[in-house]
Amino acid sequence: MNDEEMKNALQSLRDRPRVPADRREAAFERVRSEWQAALATQPAIPARTPTRRWALGLAASVMIVLFSGVFFWMSRDTASSHTQIATVLAVHGGNAFRIDDRIYDQQSIKTGPTTLSMRMASGLVVRAAPNSELRFSDEGHLQLEQGRIFVDSNPRESNAPLLVETELGAIRHLGTQYLVEYDRERLNVAVREGVIALQKPAETRSSTTAAAGEQLIVTANAPQAIERSRISATDARWGWVETVASPIDIDGMTLGAFLQWYERETGHRVTLGNADANTRLSGSITGLTPDDALAAIAVAVELTVAQKDDEVVVSKP
């Protein structure tokens, strides 16, 4: 079996995800060397005999097992030599990620069809939309190669700082919720709550801030110019974020506490009419979007829900 045939036999194992390319190639070359050394010690066998084909098939099987062992070793080594940055909190679509999966520094995250929510040790939550590519350099730096992310830095928690880096600029939060959309040609940062600071690559000592309801746009054609405009907290561009809302256990929770969660997850301002904020809830809303959860609770405790623009009014009938 020549090198090309061996590569084809090992292709599925060689291309498995989440193993750094340099380690994967080093392991492959190691297997290749051991393969050639093993062949060199074997006596010559006539090329056209069934025995040789059987022997090569057996050898290929042995090498696949060997390479599987190398892959397992590399996976264990990768996990043990890196720092855990976050844990998967919620998943929508696809099957590449599962709740409670660990996310490590330097790990390449490609969401594909999946919407993903990750909670960092500090409590800060990062959500990634489908077809996004990102990587945590360490606990304080996230590199967005392309796609969309939503950062939720809850001011009620002691969140550590996070710098989101792209080729068109870097963003840091000052206690906020914000959306970053980046496709290499255009960077858009929209703020739903709090304040962010955008620093362009060429400017290390100055930055441009944006507050809730504002968005900043930078393009590759004019990287030194920043366009500022308004954006609603309930704009359609925020919609994907709600598919991986932060989990909440409503059993025993008050209606008022649930509505606070709803406000933060959707951006809607909630007005409580004649309904009692201390009403105790029961059951579960696992798997429901915030809007569906509110609708289910309204039926359970006999409430009416009316929406007008950015405001949601909850009251007794």
Region spans (language model):
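Generic low-complexity, intrinsically disordered sequence content enriched
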Residues: 14, 43, 60-62, 70, ...
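A residue-level detector for the "anchor" residue at the start of short, highly conserved motifs
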Residues: 69-317
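Short alpha-helical interface segments
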Residues: 1-45
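Single-pass transmembrane signal-anchor helices and their membrane-water interface zones
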Residues: 22-39, 52-85
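Amphipathic alpha-helical interaction segments
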Residues: 36, 43, 62, 246-248, ...
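Acidic/proline-rich low-complexity IDRs
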Residues: 9-12, 38, 55-57, 88, ...
